[in-house]
Amino acid sequence: MTLDATLAADIDAVCRLTGQFTLRSGQQATEYFDKYLFEADPQLLLRVAREMVGLLPDGTDLLGGLELGGVPIATMVSSLTGRPALYVRKKAKEYGTCKLAEGPDVAGRRVTLIEDVITTGGAVRDATRALRAAGAEVDVVVCAIDRSPAGEHPLADVGLEVRPVLTKAELDAAREAGA
């Protein structure tokens, strides 16, 4: 639960769009949640990052921003905390350094993942496994919005704790309260 009383309503107002949209599944929808709109708004991004600071576990050495949406958030949280950030690609580069994670070496360090939205956790799961294989300790992901169904823990299979700033239920409640 966020300490910023209007954050859910403000994000919902900016990101929930109405119109005709084709979803990733190919289905048609009249409503769409465009998460990049809060990340592109410097004031909303700062408010989300401030909330995330309080959710970081003690002993975090590095902030791992997941491509693409976690990168601007991790950068802002890094700026607020002074902790270094690294940027975790979906796939390692095939040229240059051929790295999956750009930034400081992760071996022997505690990495807290930073993500914008978690629904099924696929990208977070892949990043967790890759970082652990590189020697990192990864136990927590802090996300702006947890859209997984209530009561489900999509990352329990990899032993990852999800610490959200907001949940889908909180966004829906903010919308209903303002309607």
From Swiss-Prot:
Keyword Magnesium belongs to the record: yes
CDD domains in UniProt: PRTases_typeI
E.C. no: 2.4.2.10
Catalytic reaction annotation: orotidine 5'-phosphate + diphosphate = orotate + 5-phospho-alpha-D-ribose 1-diphosphate
Binding, orotate: 119, 147
Enzyme class of the recorded protein, top EC level: transferase
Superkingdom classification of source: Bacteria
Pathway membership, UniProt: Pyrimidine metabolism; UMP biosynthesis via de novo pathway; UMP from orotate: step 1/2
Similarity field: Belongs to the purine/pyrimidine phosphoribosyltransferase family. PyrE subfamily.
Function: Catalyzes the transfer of a ribosyl phosphate group from 5-phosphoribose 1-diphosphate to orotate, leading to the formation of orotidine monophosphate (OMP).
HAMAP family: PyrE
Keyword set, alphabetical order: Glycosyltransferase, Magnesium, Pyrimidine biosynthesis, Transferase
GO biological process: 'de novo' UMP biosynthetic process; pyrimidine nucleobase biosynthetic process
Pfam (any one): Pribosyltran
Cofactor(s) it depends on: Mg(2+)
InterPro entries: OPRT, Or_phspho_trans_dom, PRibTrfase_dom, PRTase-like
Annotated protein name in UniProt: Orotate phosphoribosyltransferase
Subunit composition and interactions: Homodimer.
Regions annotated as coiled coil: none
Annotated positions binding 5-phospho-alpha-D-ribose 1-diphosphate: 24, 89-90, 93, 115-123
GO MF entry, a single one: orotate phosphoribosyltransferase activity
